[in-house]
Amino acid sequence: MERFWEHSWKRVDPERVAGYVQSIDMAPDALISALHRHGVKTVCDAGCGCGAYAMKLAANGFSVCGFDVSSRAVEIAQTLLEKAALAAELKTAGILSTGYADGTFDGVVCRDVLDHLPRAEAAAAVKELCRITKPGGIVIFTLDPLDEEYRTEPHRVNADGDYVY
């Protein structure tokens, strides 16, 4: 899985990503509001990719850490954060073993990551993200819709019916 994402991100032009991130509102206001309502101060962007959520979270006053399995994605995210004069502590790590201590964050957001994992790994990832969240904290997941467009992308279907891209 790591090789797939590293290969995918190596082909990405950071300038195009910057334009894309600026042209759309990646983190919906409802997500930001939910985090504020729950008193979240520290938040982890799990599977941060190009840093779109990290940027929106930092711009809204959160102390942000994040990780991605692709070192190239983390590099692009850091560049975009610096260009926007925003701060987040990002690192390369996998979602099954983040390297954070128990209860590090008030909240965790995980955008469109779990649906790229086999079911057993997705369940383990949920446990890991709950582990790094403080008791009483909030964990928010989003999933890609399974549109016809996605079904035409290269994938395999596991025995349990999961689509793995």
Enumerate the predicted regions with their spans:
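Class I (Rossmann-like) S-adenosyl-L-methionine-dependent methyltransferase catalytic domain
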Residues: 1-40, 49-97, 121-124, 138-165
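Conserved beta-strand/loop positions that form the S-adenosyl-L-methionine
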Residues: 46
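A short acidic, Gly/Pro-enriched loop at the edge of an enzyme's catalytic core
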Residues: 96-108
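A short beta-strand submotif of the Rossmann-like class I SAM-dependent methyltransferase core
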Residues: 110-113
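A short His-aromatic
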Residues: 115-117
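A short glycine-rich, Lys/Arg-flanked "PGG" loop and its adjoining helix->strand segment in the class I
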Residues: 123-135
